[in-house]
Amino acid sequence: MDDIRQTIRTRPREGTARATSAFTELAQQVRHQGLLRRRYGYYWTKLIAAPLVVAVCLATFVWIGESWWQLFTAAALAIVFTQIAFLGHDAAHRQIFVSGRWNDWISLVLGDLLVGMSYGWWQHKHTRHHANPNKLGSDPDIELPVIAVTAETAARHRGPVLTWMRGHQGVFFFPILLLEGLSLHASGVRRVFARGRLERRWIEIAFLSIRLGGFLTLVFLVLSPGIAFVFLAVQLGLFGFYMGIAFAPNHKGMPVVPRDMALDFLRRQVMMSRNVRGTRLLDVVMGGLNYQIEHHLFPSMPRPHLRRAAPMIAEYCRTHDVPYTSVGLLTSYAIVVRYINRVGLGERDVFTCPLIEQRSLIGS
């Protein structure tokens, strides 16, 4: 199993009560270092820049007019929208302001109005993921419609063609991400029109209508239908691909938690998450998601503090014998592909054994 992922695998020494107090101790250290303090200058700079950059891109789009050079504009917009989505992710986790109301409105403007993703849909889905990452029956992120990332999902449908595709699904994983952008928009639209409680429903409907309807109208006013469709394919494809490759290394290929297994908060968040090592440029490119362990332990920690927190939290986990996983970017993708292929081939409980061992030791 060690050839699949680089994990510091050790054993917990303490019981459940001690494990709970261990996180409290870590939280006190993090707070003492000032790593939960808001970074208003950092975030206000980004909040002001976001609409300005979008405006510049759209002005450039209109200025270029009918031309295949617009495909470069499409690529630029894909990058800009993804970076704004990362900023909306920060706001939704209360990283920007102390006020929950301010964070909510920033999330609505960034997510619904600028990117075209429903904040209500994201909040409903992402909150469940954070509560129980990689847990069967609880984490919606491991219930994908096309790719099977758990043995339970892979076993539901069988047949010669599907069996072959599942056995090679790691190869198809990245091309499928090209459809993720369209899926994110569609999921948001379905959510705002679905039954059930949704705060600020009409605001979301209005913002999504302006963003999606306005953007489509502008594209077809400036471009001929042929170029317009290719432009949208490039913009949506690259947007979805960028979003997908930023989120994929975080948990895929990490242990899948059985439905009946209970873990303390520290192990539940650390053992199911993977950090991606890299430079500050990688921090920008991945929107801070490369510090997934720190983010899961302290969701409201401002993005600029994650890099500072990582060495301290890694050392704390080593001291308390909690497996802390950190790999390079290319290694993380290789792990994801190999793991998805193994699941597709029908291997069961690929990473369950270490979890069962941990649970038995925690309870001892």
Regions found by a protein language model. Name each.
Residues 2-29, 172-183:
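Short, charged cytosolic
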Residues 12-49, 54:
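Low-complexity, highly charged intrinsically disordered N-terminal segments
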Residues 35, 76-197, 258-349:
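Membrane-embedded catalytic scaffold of the fatty acid hydroxylase/desaturase
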Residues 38-84, 111-116, 167-184, 197-246:
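Alpha-helical bilayer-embedded segments of polytopic membrane proteins, i.e.
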Residues 55, 59, 67, 344-355:
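Long, continuous compositionally biased terminal/linker segments
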Residues 178, 243-260:
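Transmembrane alpha-helix/helix-exit interface in multi-pass inner-membrane proteins
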